[in-house]
From Swiss-Prot:
One of its GO terms (cellular component) is cytoplasm. One of its GO terms (biological process) is ubiquitin-dependent protein catabolic process via the N-end rule pathway. Belongs to the R-transferase family. Bpt subfamily. It catalyses: N-terminal L-glutamyl-[protein] + L-leucyl-tRNA(Leu) = N-terminal L-leucyl-L-glutamyl-[protein] + tRNA(Leu) + H(+); N-terminal L-aspartyl-[protein] + L-leucyl-tRNA(Leu) = N-terminal L-leucyl-L-aspartyl-[protein] + tRNA(Leu) + H(+). It is an enzyme of class 2 (transferase). It is found in: Cytoplasm. It comes from Campylobacter jejuni subsp. jejuni serotype O:2 (strain ATCC 700819 / NCTC 11168). It comes from the Bacteria. Keywords: Acyltransferase, Cytoplasm, Transferase. This is Aspartate/glutamate leucyltransferase. HAMAP family: Bpt. Pfam families: ATE_C, ATE_N.
């Protein structure tokens, strides 16, 4: 297993305008599922063959959050979202790349640029492949959502030994009635329940960042306390 570690220089934080960020990376050529799981449990995130975590000086606003699947019950509003999507076709498959994917990705980010002032980058086929397809091994999947044979949402996930790691989701803003972002996460929870998995790893919760603060609404959940290196025994998550 080839592994290369490196860090970025300090840069503007993408989540908080008054903060600076620094990121630690691991490039892992062919990452086994169990190593992926151990890294995710310790606050890392996977994109392609790269794993990353923040190592920012004097800041700990990025908190790893996971949903407790076995204790999670759908609310009335969440059941309404599921009912609205009764005719939405959901396919679980290995990560894919097509013109449809890239068009939907671009449409979603143009919308978010206008709505939430996200910084948008044009993504090529190669860049998308490197971020969301490469390195899927025996754990990477996408949930593809279709309404009337139109691809309207893609949710990229890793199915690990103790849970599902939610990597990235994008959807067609023209179908806002269907609450596709919420519906995709509810599908993750349903899949985890069927597979007897304990957690949905949602990535980073940042209280002062609107795009990430919503994650705390999914309860019960736990927050990772501190950081641990790979194979250090005790990893502490607290409600």
């Amino acid at each position: 297993m080839l592994e290369i570690g490196f860090c970025t220089l300090e840069d503007q934080c993408p989540y908080l305008k008054d903060k600076r960020s620094r990121i630690e990376y691991k490039y892992i050529e062919n990452c086994p599922k169990e190593i992926n799981n151990e890294l995710i449990k310790r606050g890392w995130r996977r994109f392609g063959r790269y794993f990353s975590r923040p190592i920012c000086k004097d800041c700990d606003e990025c908190l790893s959050l996971r949903i407790l699947v076995n204790e999670y019950n759908f609310s009335r509003s969440e059941r309404r979202v599921v009912n609205k999507n009764i005719n939405t076709k959901v396919i679980l498959r290995t990560p894919n790349l097509s013109n449809e994917h890239l068009f939907l990705y671009d449409k979603y980010h143009r919308f978010m640029e206008e709505k939430k002032n996200w910084k948008r980058y044009d993504l090529s086929f190669k860049q998308y492949y490197n971020l969301y397809v490469d390195g899927f091994m025996n754990f990477g999947y996408e949930l593809a959502f279709y309404i009337e044979d139109k691809l309207v949402c893609v949710d990229l996930i890793d199915i690990l030994e103790d849970g599902i790691s939610s990597i990235y989701c994008f959807y067609d803003p023209d179908f806002s009635y269907f609450s596709l972002g919420k519906f995709s996460l509810l599908n993750e929870i349903q899949i985890a329940k069927k597979m007897n998995l304990d957690y949905i790893y949602l990535g980073y919760f940042v209280k002062k960042c609107q795009s990430l603060s919503y994650k705390a609404d999914y309860t019960p959940n736990e927050i990772l306390k501190g950081t641990k290196e790979l194979f250090e025994n005790e990893v502490l998550w607290e409600k």
